[in-house]
Amino acid sequence: MPRVNYIPNCEYSDFLNRIPTVSWDGNVFPVTNGYRFVNREMIGSTSERTFIATIIPPGISHINTCLSTIFKHDYDLLDFFSMSLSIVVDYRVKCTGMGHANQSLVNQLPLLSNEKFRASLHARSMALVSITEHYKKLWCSIYSSEFKIQYWSRDLPQLPQDFFTNLTPEWQRNCALRSDYSRRQALVEIDVLVAQALGLTLEELLAIYRIQFPVMRQYEADTWYDQNGRIIFTPSKGLVGVGLPRTARKADLKNGFVFNVDSPDWTGGDCTDQAIGWDDVKHLQTGTVSVTFDDYTRSDEGERRTVTWQAPFIKPDREDDYKVAWAFFAQDKESA
């Protein structure tokens, strides 16, 4: 699990006694015993996304900047979580004008009721959240043989076309989507599936995106991916440090960054002692760009890490992706 910034400011026994409990079927147990839906309590309607949510595994606690909700059944949890990932439900939250996603607001949000969308939504939302083995029990509980017959709405080199067919009833590392592009595609398809499940039209989904999500549109308009689905450049303020900077930074060299470009299209000479930015390499049609640096994500000591991007680089069009996914799933549900 990621490192944390907070520890309980009391004896552990006192901390355990303070955990809220829930009573189901005559049994009383701490809410931390189960998987929970958790959302950021404070929201900003002018941000890229308003409603920020995930699922936390058993044993995890949080401070009051978050709100958690426990469900009696895992299927209800996934129904609610899948819906919450969509811009459709995010738009519903924006429309309240509220600054806090409290229990009153969360109780207003829709729960998936159309079962024919369940497998498609669950497969994608579980693949997004099940990054570590802490989710293996939930995966085993939710897994359906229908997961294996899912398909991406697009056939692109950035998308692993065998991802769904390789899913297994027992959680393993390849049950999670790990590339930037595949995770984006899953969210695009969830947007479409939720819109269809709620009876919206494609035009209404596009209008929601165009009018209510200007920051997301701004980021999407200039986020670029390599052939393996890795982001090489993005202006997103939520992804600071991901990819290359727009222009070369001499400070990177002082911080131990080492750049390399291996491409016949490269005319910049030897990269030794040379900083590289997105503007320097965006024209490449073949070859690779790499950077080696000290990564402090997993420990304060850091570790040497190399990130490589494969040219050429692409910029997807979210509106076009919505249109393609809409037609794909509309046909799929009609034939089901």
Language model region names:
Residues 1-336:
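S-adenosyl-L-methionine
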